[in-house]
Amino acid sequence: MKLKRTAYLLFLYLSSSLLICIKNSFCNKNNTRCLSGPCQNNSTCKHFPQDNNCCLDTANNLDKDCEDLKDPCFSSPCQGIATCVKIPGEGNFLCQCPPGYSGLNCETATNSCGGNLCQHGGTCRKDPEHPVCICPPGYAGRFCETDHNECASSPCHNGAMCQDGINGYSCFCVPGYQGRHCDLEVDECVSDPCKNEAVCLNEIGRYTCVCPQEFSGVNCELEIDECRSQPCLHGATCQDAPGGYSCDCAPGFLGEHCELSVNECESQPCLHGGLCVDGRNSYHCDCTGSGFTGMHCESLIPLCWSKPCHNDATCEDTVDSYICHCRPGYTGALCETDINECSSNPCQFWGECVELSSEGLYGNTAGLPSSFSYVGASGYVCICQPGFTGIHCEEDVDECLLHPCLNGGTCENLPGNYACHCPFDDTSRTFYGGENCSEILLGCTHHQCLNNGKCIPHFQNGQHGFTCQCLSGYAGPLCETVTTLSFGSNGFLWVTSGSHTGIGPECNISLRFHTVQPNALLLIRGNKDVSMKLELLNGCVHLSIEVWNQLKVLLSISHNTSDGEWHFVEVTIAETLTLALVGGSCKEKCTTKSSVPVENHQSICALQDSFLGGLPMGTANNSVSVLNIYNVPSTPSFVGCLQDIRFDLNHITLENVSSGLSSNVKAGCLGKDWCESQPCQNRGRCINLWQGYQCECDRPYTGSNCLKEYVAGRFGQDDSTGYAAFSVNDNYGQNFSLSMFVRTRQPLGLLLALENSTYQYVSVWLEHGSLALQTPGSPKFMVNFFLSDGNVHLISLRIKPNEIELYQSSQNLGFISVPTWTIRRGDVIFIGGLPDREKTEVYGGFFKGCVQDVRLNSQTLEFFPNSTNNAYDDPILVNVTQGCPGDNTCKSNPCHNGGVCHSLWDDFSCSCPTNTAGRACEQVQWCQLSPCPPTAECQLLPQGFECIANAVFSGLSREILFRSNGNITRELTNITFAFRTHDTNVMILHAEKEPEFLNISIQDARLFFQLRSGNSFYTLHLMGSQLVNDGTWHQVTFSMIDPVAQTSRWQMEVNDQTPFVISEVATGSLNFLKDNTDIYVGDQSVDNPKGLQGCLSTIEIGGIYLSYFENLHGFPGKPQEEQFLKVSTNMVLTGCLPSNACHSSPCLHGGNCEDSYSSYRCACLSGWSGTHCEINIDECFSSPCIHGNCSDGVAAYHCRCEPGYTGVNCEVDVDNCKSHQCANGATCVPEAHGYSCLCFGNFTGRFCRHSRLPSTVCGNEKRNFTCYNGGSCSMFQEDWQCMCWPGFTGEWCEEDINECASDPCINGGLCRDLVNRFLCICDVAFAGERCELDLADDRLLGIFTAVGSGTLALFFILLLAGVASLIASNKRATQGTYSPSGQEKAGPRVEMWIRMPPPALERLI
């Protein structure tokens, strides 16, 4: 269907294209009408079919006879960009001149560059006679109005297309050429595309391969196969060869093409009168009637006719006997013996082996067929036990695939079986058990597990029961036995050999312990020959074995276990000795092994005594605790808890140890966390000692609970001077440390000096608030750490041989290299100063602040010792007081402006009023009072404030007048401001007081400065070198080079770009502006009646601002003495944008952005509106389409007319019946979307071209009815029924199926229901079977544009012939886009064809 429709459309398209092509071909021929030369004035004659007048002379603007001028403006008499206007009825013209020009033809210039005279960015320059436009590259003409056509010189070669650009051009090459001018031919043969030694011929845009004889293809890549024509006969094999072939004949044939058959009967192979019959590469002997048999009739009829062989064996006659060939599974001379294949027991997992030759088992044995056959009697089958499968029952059936386990049980597959692991249901608190977890376990309903033991129920032999899973520290069937023991001081537990069972192949000792002791005995076991000891040394577990008092084994695990947590240790003695620390925080290297130090490891495991926690007390040399019997030295006894002690899996408890064999051991863990009450104060760290605690105090605290604090020494109280001196009472050698806490706010002063009577070892002092350190002969070492901040700092000196390191807390501040010296008894440590004031002043004077907890190594040097046991004698204290109080710094009332003083340690702070600031409230914070309008920024000045803002000038704004307030005393030697504008000539500032004056302006887009001042007779001029009318900000400063001189040259700085512009002459300063001089900002210039149009910052003259805001009502006045006051009363518009708002291109869709400095405005192109030209004006808003749908465009609209209407606005009614196709006398009825045919007589169809389908009477005498619409009568399931034509349904085929019910037409198409089909009437913008093709899609256009005209014409002729043939062969009435012929083979009623033949093709409409 689609093929024929496509062919039909293609036929129409190609026909119209061909006609157009033929028409255009003939239209270009010259006509003989021009042969007479009727045209005058050198004009050209060209024939037009619709007009006999044929003269064309557009170049000379002549009429059709080339005699008179048609348009007086045709020759462009107006010069430049002037506009020529034709005067009606006079044949004359008038020139409308642009600004700056006059005259009849606008040829006279008025020497003015105004009005944007130069186009395309050209720069206008004044000339003595007329303005001159300097054009940018790519443009020419007097006003730069002409785009220079770089393509005029035809720079592109070889048929390339030249595209003109701005100051350049681009060449688009045709295929086969490249390069900027398309002058380089592409050699397509460079890539060697031709294969198999073919010759490559380079051509324009392509290449051609000349192939050898035996190859073909575009690139000669295909070898020619001579065998393709199948030259070899009678099944011969063709062998392809270069340039030829050969035939390998099948047996029985010969010849070049195997065309000759060989006669195998020529040798007369048949004996005894047998008839030879020739075949294809064979023969056979017909022995009929000869009394012989065999291939050549050579054998008498055989003895096997008596069938001597058993079990369906095959009999073979010999010369005087026969041979039986047995079937598989049988043996013997007559095949009478059945081979027993089950003798090797091939079936696994108790499978039963059954031989296939057991004929009696067939029909009643699973796994065997119902009947016996000798063909399958060889072998065996395995009948598997339940749970197994496979040929040999080798595969275990996964019973878990059937999910036998209930209630969430987990199934485990077993050989031939399965096991269910039943869960505990946390929701219902129910245990399940039984084979399939179907039983609710009741054993724990009234369980007796003690001490939080977990009850585990079970169901065995139909009985419910339970077991108890005990927590650590408990054992027994009901967890009733306590296995936790608490060991006090000197406690022990003696386990005799009778307390536990005998030995096995290995022995195992395990226990859990809980202690804070770093050193303790856990276990000792053995005798005088061999002993094993398990102990804690420095918190780590150690295991040692001694043999005859010699240490043989020492194992240890480097992990701290003296942390008050539970730890599990296990010792195993077998072939190797293993020590393991299990669980807890030990993550790696928690197991260590060694060989057993004795030949028989069971000698260590022998039944012998063991001691847990300690040994019975005895005394030996040096008061060491020993085992009295064997005199074994021991570590301190264990204080803590042992739990779950097992000797060879036997629990050791107090109950199974004899009375009197333990001391200070109790059941349970009675340890107390002494640190729980946090007894250590002032950040002290508490250490739990099981029977007490110990506090490690942070400096400067001490005492058992860190409650005491070393008394600080106060130096320089109320600005006094003093020091402290300590005499060293021991020899400390070359390695020692000296540390102290220091608090100060003073940036200078001696902190520490260490010396003897003749030599000063080291001195430490404050310099600019940081520490400095020096030794004799070495440079000063300054530390990058600020100490004088009033905080407490721990300072430490660590003296080593040849080096001193300085620390602040744990931070290393650096080191210095020093000679080695030794601290001896009698040396003196000075703190805070020296007895000699002059020596002290060398280090910035005496120290002011506090020093606390001075330590030499671990010895404390106390200023005020409270014990007579101090290792040092009383120090020398001069003006050193106890504690660390601060001076009363508020005594002198340091706060100004009503500030309130608050005393700090050796410092003060002021609570200042809201309008003041500074350490002493000496600064008034004017800007915090919000003195400026919202559009201005407040800037604090030394004596007041100023409101800073950027002013916006519109070109029509009034000038702003300023005057001095008469109090300016400073020298005015400079002026600074910033601006941005597009003006070329404009005045910025003007001030004048005869004979002195100041002008700052822009001339020819450059900054211009004029000044006459002081006693100078010269007017100073400065002209900038850069253009400043680009709309961006420019920062400008004019200043005297020598500001202290009476006259000086001036310089101009623009945007800090060097070199600066410097004047050639000198003049005075701007001091004349102090004397009531009027200063005008934004004034008009002489040659520009408009004022400044742009932005101007607040101008600064000599550091004094020209504020745009007078003292407004509601805002405080400015307190500074020196001011320039705004005299004019006009309001100044502020709020200039920091940059050109048009730089971001805010205007869309070609809109032109106009910078207004405080904002921007978009001038939109036709069809667009909105702030940014973002709104496409809806031309459809007025509903211009009368009978159609309106599609909005840009500044336009398009009407898509409803069927039956046409015209720009769909206003014209189309007569749809004008070209109707109604046949057979039918009447055309016009409709909105087309027309319909009212059929006459016995005709039907859309165009009434077909006869109505006949009716058939169906049934018998009892039951009869009529089948309409061509339906036929048929017997179906013993009843008469109507079999309907495609497109009809119902019991009597009376209902026409509505093919439009599925709404097949898309994109607004209208569906028309027809017989067995539908027709989509598409909107004008769509086409296709279902209106699915969008005609506006560019992909549907220009498919054939790339084909050459000559080739295309030939292709059209051939294609049209084929299409016409195809249409003729398929010509039939298939209206619309739905073909019933497709339904005939693939429609929903194809299943009826088995009962009724398909209709004739002519009647399927």
UniProtKB/Swiss-Prot annotation:
One of its GO terms (molecular function) is calcium ion binding. Residues 1361-1405 are cytoplasmic. Residues 1-27 form the signal peptide. The chain crosses the membrane at residues 1340-1360. Residues 30-67, 69-107, 109-145, 147-183, 185-221, 223-259, 261-298, 300-336, 338-394, 396-438, 440-480, 671-707, 886-922, 923-959, 1138-1174, 1176-1211, 1213-1249, 1254-1294, 1296-1332 form the EGF-like domain. GO terms for biological process: blood vessel remodeling; cellular response to light stimulus; detection of light stimulus involved in visual perception; establishment of bipolar cell polarity involved in cell morphogenesis; eye photoreceptor cell development; gene expression; glial cell differentiation; membrane organization. It comes from the Eukaryota. Component of a complex composed of PALS1, CRB1 and EPB41L5. Within the complex, interacts (via intracellular domain) with PALS1 and EPB41L5 (via FERM domain). Forms a complex with MPP4 and PALS1. Interacts with MPDZ/MUPP1 and MPP4. This is Protein crumbs homolog 1. It comes from Mus musculus (Mouse). The lineage of its organism: Eukaryota, Metazoa, Chordata, Craniata, Vertebrata. The gene is Crb1.
